[in-house]
Amino acid sequence: MKLLVLLVTLLVLSWTSAEDLGDQEILENNEDNNHESELGEPAAQHTDDETSQLGQALIPRCRKMPGVKMC
């Protein structure tokens, strides 16, 4: 039973860490685009899809897995 709990915990932690890394990449890309505009170059135009992805990265979201509730 303890082994099962340990395995589920590791699975959840690895899954959430992978998602957080993806969110961080979106934020870093946005910072790069802002830096370009500070240099006097035109800032990159964001598509609606990119803007919604950035908004998603900033809003905490519930993660649902069978038998596990995390918010």
UniProtKB/Swiss-Prot annotation:
GO terms for cellular component: extracellular region. It is found in: Secreted. Disulfide bonds join 62-71. Residues 1-18 form the signal peptide. It comes from the Eukaryota. Inhibited by tissue-kallikrein inhibitor TKI and trasylol. Plasma kallikrein inhibitor PKSI527 and classical inhibitors of serine-, metallo-, thiol- or aspartate-peptidases evokes a minor inhibition of the peptide digestion. Residues 22-31 have a biased composition (Acidic residues). GO terms for molecular function: hydrolase activity; toxin activity. Residues 22-54 are annotated as: Disordered. Expressed by the venom gland. Its EC number is 3.4.-.-. The keyword Mitochondrion does not apply. It is an enzyme of class 3 (hydrolase). Belongs to the natterin family. This is Natterin-P.
